[in-house]
Amino acid sequence: MLFATLEHILTHISFSTISIVITIHLRALLVRELGGLRDSSEKGMIATFFSITGFLVSRWLSSGHFPLSNLYESLIFLSWALYILHTIPKVQNSKNDLSTITTPSTILTQGFATSGLLTEMHQSTILVPALQSQWLMMHVSMMLLSYATLLCGSLLSAAILIIRFRNNFNFFSKKNKNVLKKTFLFSKMEYFYAKRSYFKSASVPSFPNYYKYQLTERLDSWSYRVISLGFTLLTIGILCGAVWANEAWGSYWNWDPKETWAFITWTIFAIYLHSRTNQNWKGTNSALVASIGFLIIWICYFGINLLGIGLHSYGSFTLTPN
């Protein structure tokens, strides 16, 4: 009872905090005079991280196993993974800011986890025999970390497509340039370096607006780096799952719906990484492939759980009428 109460408190603290954080972040982004509020949003993200971490530890102690046995627990872990991604640029002392993607993703993920749809999964239960393995933590954690990473990379690619094809709205007008500078931290040194690179390289596309060009180049670079990391984690997760499947079911691969869609996900992002090596496909075409991958990930992760079919139906849930 104590652990259940603690988990309830920590979950709602983290959700409330992240809701405040995204409000502060958007106001600081749109209103120049409130730029100092970014420090407050970062403190809020830290508080959210410790709340989610506390929940995972409490759940682990109360259930006796790592909390990855159902959709509710996996969504909380996914929120935790998104925060880890949020901190990567700061650890590297990078000027790039992924919070525009990671913060809304965290609040949406945790908002769904704490909604009434998953109430029946809030209580920890004993693992079914097939899940009582040391591979549970390794396989599922790798898969969820890869999902979080690939989702962020796909959203960055989707942003590239939106920027390149959204011509009816002049987002890059003079009054909005300060937003771009604050969000992506342009500097004079970067300007002259990019300008020099622009004239040296014939492969760089020509944009009527320099800020549009610089922004899409930044997003494309970050998308490639994030998706490369996610693809590596996905590969490790699939290999761990194959070994576990052989121990549990006597076969490395059964073409279960979850396995099939995991393979499709892996193939889509393999195509993306391969397309990056071709100059004719690099840019808009590769971003389109990654954007398709965003939908494939949600089908693989959420859609199969919603259907509750196949060998991976342990964490599924059914929508019950009120």
From Swiss-Prot:
InterPro entries the record matches: Cyt_c_assembly, Cyt_c_biogenesis_CcsA, Cyt_c_biogenesis_CcsA/CcmC
Record membrane topology: Multi-pass membrane protein
Places the protein is found: Plastid, Chloroplast thylakoid membrane
GO cellular component: chloroplast thylakoid membrane
GO molecular function per UniProt: heme binding
Functional description taken from the UniProt entry: Required during biogenesis of c-type cytochromes (cytochrome c6 and cytochrome f) at the step of heme attachment.
Record family assignment: Belongs to the CcmF/CycK/Ccl1/NrfE/CcsA family.
Subunit structure and binding partners: May interact with Ccs1.
Official protein name in the record: Cytochrome c biogenesis protein CcsA
UniProt organism field: Brachypodium distachyon
Organism placement in taxonomy: Eukaryota, Viridiplantae, Streptophyta, Embryophyta, Tracheophyta
Gene: ccsA
